[in-house]
Amino acid sequence: MSKMCLINVIIVLSLSSCATYQPNQVDDICKIFHGETDWYEDAQAANKRWGTPIGLMMAIIKQESTFRHDVKPPRPTFLFIPLPRRSSAYGYAQAQNPAWQDYQKATGNWSHDRDDF
């Protein structure tokens, strides 16, 4: 019995460590930054590098993705059959493939993902 409990605890802990932060109150940036302190540090670094106000960056991310890392545009349907998406936008910023490739080329950050904050 104790081995089974230990296995269940290990499974739950390993699965919970894979989860990404999803704020439940997207209208309060202070609570979002309090829940995920790395986001504030990243926002400060972006502010320093690009000169964009933190509030503006967070407002754009809220509008584009509601702070969901894996959001994509909806798929159109034809008679209940899902069709291809009309846009390649993906992630927090909803950057399309050409814009994301331009960003990677300009910054040299080939390992960055659109779904990473």
Regions found by a protein language model. Give the residues of each.
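Catalytic glycan-binding domains that act on GlcNAc-containing polysaccharides
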Residues: 19-117
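Bacterial N-terminal signal peptides
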Residues: 7-16
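Bacterial N-terminal signal peptides that target proteins for export
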Residues: 1-7
